[in-house]
Amino acid sequence: MLTSYVKVLEQNNLRLTKPRIALLKCLIEHQDWHNLSQIKTHLDLANQPSTLASIYNNLRILAKLKLINIFVDPERFETYYCLRHAEHNHIYLFDEVKQQFFTLPLTDGQIKTLLETQNHTSKVKLNDFYIVARGEINND
């Protein structure tokens, strides 16, 4: 899996620095959504210490290359990062109690049905489509 991400870096003439490779390995190993401080903790625990500035700069590079997804929680002003896999459609549900994301995949047909109800089908090109919902998971 790392090889495909490294290939994108090489194709874009980016150096394969130790911090950049360590960040990719971290995101591969921890395939959930994480904020900047959580990523730093993962790297520190893996004996790959890095500064927050270096992590942030590398995340920006990975985002520009469309290797990661970014979600900003407007209520907390918190940014979350997740490694991007194959293009596919999702609803992301952020559980307020557990402070974590759950992913619900959608088919193109389901997305088109959602868009048709809002008369947006002619305006949207489906490459990736994300719906982010916030709430609480009730297991009753």
UniProtKB/Swiss-Prot annotation:
One of its GO terms (molecular function) is DNA-binding transcription factor activity. It comes from the Bacteria. This is Uncharacterized protein MG236. One of its GO terms (biological process) is negative regulation of DNA-templated transcription.
